[in-house]
């Protein structure tokens, strides 16, 4: 059986030579193992590790443009306030809300707003870090990590 990716986020890290890819899937152990094996086979992969959901900080960003007029604007402001969403743009006929939080919070916010006319919606996908000190994957000396790095196919390393 395969797996479906729920979220995929790519970002820079504190090391300019390394990008971080965060993949979120809902799966069983077999599908998770399949994803790990397939990712480790990629030539450009340095390390693959699984974050424990309970011991991780996960965040997602939502930008939501909703139809807003004099009749529903105060309701929308109240809902935004309850969820600690920011109003980042306001026009005579719409409002743009920004919400950051765990994916479950974003889902709940969207469910509450389901009866309103959503004009546009954009979610970033999940980014995550493990709680506490340095995660075991970050404890290798930088020179050891860099020595393991290979150039992308069709490219060459600068001399």
Regions found by a protein language model. Name each.
Residues 1-20, 24-159:
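Long, contiguous binding/interaction regions
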């Amino acid at each position: 059986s395969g797996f479906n990716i729920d979220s995929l986020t790519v970002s820079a890290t504190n090391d300019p030579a390394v990008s971080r890819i965060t993949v979120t899937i809902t799966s069983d152990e077999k599908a998770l193992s399949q994803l790990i094996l397939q990712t480790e086979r990629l030539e450009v992969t340095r390390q693959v590790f699984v974050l424990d959901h309970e011991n991780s900080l996960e965040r997602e960003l939502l930008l939501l443009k909703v139809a807003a007029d004099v009749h529903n604007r105060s309701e929308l402001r109240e809902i935004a306030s309850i969820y600690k969403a920011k109003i980042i743009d306001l026009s005579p006929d719409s409002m743009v809300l920004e919400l950051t939080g765990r994916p479950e919070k974003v889902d709940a916010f969207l469910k509450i707003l389901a009866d309103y006319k959503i004009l546009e919606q954009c979610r970033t996908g999940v980014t995550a870090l493990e709680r506490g000190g340095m995660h075991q994957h970050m404890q290798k000396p930088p020179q050891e990590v860099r020595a393991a790095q290979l150039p992308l196919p069709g490219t060459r390393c600068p001399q």
